């Protein structure tokens, strides 16, 4: 295709409506029609990236293949499209201003007064078009974070306005709004949507397609009313009624021919219907699963729904492919004690020890791990979760009672987890960890190698601390095997206890490499083992 088509997804009325899901769903439908699609997210906050943001503030921090800390929506993009993202797929206001200031210091604007318009908006437009110019994408779908009317979104919306003017038919805007249901009146209200569109029009943008989030199905007269008062064609008003799972959203949009509407508006032939066989099979497995596998996720941010989003989704995908429903139980690690651990975990088929940073909640994770190991409960530790496995084993099996990570306590004898050598001179917090995909060689005959079905994998990382190799021999002799390591540095990236049915820890993050059509083998194997445990316990 000669010209890349650019689609912007904006949001109005309230935040958290699911712009990322709508963008990913539309991208999936276009991809299923044979188009090459890229998705990107523009966030209006001034942080360079979300790497230093507390999960309570922003939810999960996602990590791309090339080592960029990104918004969790990139996880949705990858899970829906089954294609990796990069640094170019997530831009923040902070990055935009940083780039402009750097150019100003280099003299690229010499003689000019640097302003929001045109310099900031030009930099935004440059980043929007970057993916389309560097790669052969037919569509670039850009999600604009925030809500129309927010001050911080104005430069992005001005950039969208300019691009719609510059690109003409090759650019369109999808606006997602909320249609509330007033229970007392027994009716839905479209006025918030009308006002949201009016705000968008005030900055010079006429939306081409409206997507209406609603809890109740909207009648044709409501859709016609919205079309009339928002100046949108009737066939360009799409409703997104709440569904049991986000993976049904592409089918909901397809049923209303949203992908066909997009193709017509950008001047392309509609062609055959999208090839969504695998997607339908996935949902069929989900809806027909009868039995349940119960997994405990032990972490310190479990009360926040988005804090471990990729782990939640990876476990759910693995359960579905194993023909089971997932019953995911959130266990706050700060609340786990020796007194209550047995009661807390007794009905679990397996547990996952979540990643994280800092000392809060670590002792609870250690208590949970001791119980799981001694009761042969299938356990998967991720990042800090693996490090906690090492600490627990050092204290309770090797007898190193003061064993710890130097992230928590440096004045100890047994530093079984220590700061990586290359991190010891690092002073900046942001973007300075060991980030992105690295190779890992797996030990032949290990449970981990069996899970992956190969002895060489590449997974993503996000950490500063590592297993202290000085203790490797002691751990091996005591029964904890180092079964994965970086072939270049020798860094231990995975451990397991062969005497247990499944007690595996990995320094990397397998959840960043699991999609709807390609679930991560490690989660698949873990869920299989949990199912076996459930059956054995029943017998």
Curated annotation (Swiss-Prot):
ATP binds at residues 16-21, 73. One of its GO terms (molecular function) is metal ion binding. Allosterically activated by GTP, when glutamine is the substrate; GTP has no effect on the reaction when ammonia is the substrate. The allosteric effector GTP functions by stabilizing the protein conformation that binds the tetrahedral intermediate(s) formed during glutamine hydrolysis. Inhibited by the product CTP, via allosteric rather than competitive inhibition. GO terms for cellular component: cytosol. Residues 1-268 are annotated as: Amidoligase domain. Pathway: Pyrimidine metabolism; CTP biosynthesis via de novo pathway; CTP from UDP: step 2/2. Belongs to the CTP synthase family. This is CTP synthase. The gene is pyrG.
């Amino acid at each position: 295709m000669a010209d890349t088509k650019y689609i912007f997804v904006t949001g109005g009325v309230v935040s958290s409506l699911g712009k990322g899901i709508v963008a990913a769903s539309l991208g999936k439908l276009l991809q299923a029609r044979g188009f090459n699609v890229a998705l990107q997210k523009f966030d209006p906050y001034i942080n360079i990236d979300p790497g230093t943001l507390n999960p309570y503030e922003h939810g999960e921090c996602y990590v791309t293949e090339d080592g960029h800390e990104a918004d969790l929506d990139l996880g949705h993009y990858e899970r829906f499209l089954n294609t990796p993202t990069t640094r170019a797929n997530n831009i923040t206001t902070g990055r935009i201003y940083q780039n402009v200031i750097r150019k100003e210091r280099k003299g690229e604007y010499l003689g000019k007064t640097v302003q929001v318009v045109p310099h900031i908006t030009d930099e935004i437009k440059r980043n929007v078009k970057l993916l389309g110019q560097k790669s052969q994408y037919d569509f670039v779908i850009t999600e604009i974070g925030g809500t129309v009317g927010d001050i911080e979104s104005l430069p992005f919306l001005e950039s969208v306005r300019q691009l719609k003017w510059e690109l003409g038919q090759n650019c369109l805007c999808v606006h997602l709004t909320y249609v509330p249901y007033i229970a007392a009146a027994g009716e839905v209200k479209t006025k918030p949507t009308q006002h949201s569109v009016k705000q968008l029009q005030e900055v010079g943008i006429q939306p081409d397609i409206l997507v209406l989030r609603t809890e109740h199905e909207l009648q044709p007269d409501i859709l016609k009313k919205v079309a009339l008062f928002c100046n949108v064609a009737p066939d360009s008003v799409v409703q997104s009624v709440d569904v049991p799972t986000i993976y049904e959203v592409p089918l909901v949009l397809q049923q209303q021919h949203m992908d066909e509407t997009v193709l017509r508006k950008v001047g392309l032939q509609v062609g055959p219907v999208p090839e969504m066989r695998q997607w339908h099979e996935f949902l069929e497995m989900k809806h027909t699963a009868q039995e349940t596998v119960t997994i405990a996720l032990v972490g310190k941010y479990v009360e926040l729904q988005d804090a471990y989003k990729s782990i939640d989704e990876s476990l759910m995908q693995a359960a579905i492919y194993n023909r089971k429903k997932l019953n995911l139980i959130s266990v706050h690690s700060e609340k786990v004690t020796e007194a209550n651990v047995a009661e807390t975990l007794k009905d679990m088929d397996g547990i996952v020890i979540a990643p994280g940073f800092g000392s809060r909640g670590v002792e609870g994770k250690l208590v949970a791990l001791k119980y799981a190991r001694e009761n042969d409960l299938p356990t998967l530790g991720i990042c800090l979760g693996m490090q906690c496995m090492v600490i627990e084993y050092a204290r309770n099996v090797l007898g190193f009672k003061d064993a710890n990570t130097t992230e928590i306590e440096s004045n100890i004898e047994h530093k079984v987890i220590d700061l990586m050598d290359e991190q010891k001179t690092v002073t900046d917090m942001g973007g300075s960890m060991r980030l992105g995909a690295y190779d890992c060689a797996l030990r032949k005959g290990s449970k981990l190698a069996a899970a992956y079905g190969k002895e060489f994998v590449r997974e993503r990382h996000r950490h500063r601390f590592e297993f202290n190799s000085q203790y490797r021999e002691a751990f091996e002799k005591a029964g904890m095997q180092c079964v994965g390591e970086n072939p270049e540095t020798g860094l231990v990236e995975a451990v397991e206890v062969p005497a247990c049915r499944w007690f595996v820890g990995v320094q990397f993050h397998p959840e960043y490499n699991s999609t709807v059509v390609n679930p991560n083998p490690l989660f698949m194997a873990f869920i299989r083992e949990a199912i076996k445990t459930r059956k054995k316990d029943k017998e």
